[in-house]
C-alpha cells in the first residue's frame, strides 16, 4: 500500500445520517468535489469504507 490516499467527495451529504456526516467531517470532507490527501492507516480505511458510496478514492 502507498503511504497516502486521495479521497474526493463526489456525492452530497445532505439527507444522510449524523454518523455519516461525522465520518465525512473526520475525513475533512465538507463540500462536494473537495479532495483531501490522508495517511493510509487502518482507521482512515475504516472511515472510507463506511462512506464509500459517497467517495472516489485514488491510491
Swiss-Prot record:
UniProt GO MF annotations: structural constituent of ribosome
InterPro entries, A to Z: Ribo_uL30_ferredoxin-like_sf (IPR036919), Ribosomal_uL30_bac-type (IPR005996), Ribosomal_uL30_ferredoxin-like (IPR016082)
Keyword Transcription in annotation: no
Gene Ontology cellular component list: cytosolic large ribosomal subunit
Gene Ontology process terms (BP): translation
UniProt keyword Methyltransferase present: no
Pfam families: Ribosomal_L30
The entry's keywords: Ribonucleoprotein, Ribosomal protein
Family: Belongs to the universal ribosomal protein uL30 family.
HAMAP family reported for this sequence: Ribosomal_uL30_B (MF_01371_B)
Subunit field text: Part of the 50S ribosomal subunit.
PANTHER family in alphabetical order: LARGE RIBOSOMAL SUBUNIT PROTEIN UL30M (PTHR15892:SF2), MITOCHONDRIAL RIBOSOMAL PROTEIN L30 (PTHR15892)
Protein name: Large ribosomal subunit protein uL30
Source species of the chain: Geotalea daltonii (strain DSM 22248 / JCM 15807 / FRC-32) (Geobacter daltonii)
Lineage: Bacteria, Pseudomonadati, Thermodesulfobacteriota, Desulfuromonadia, Geobacterales
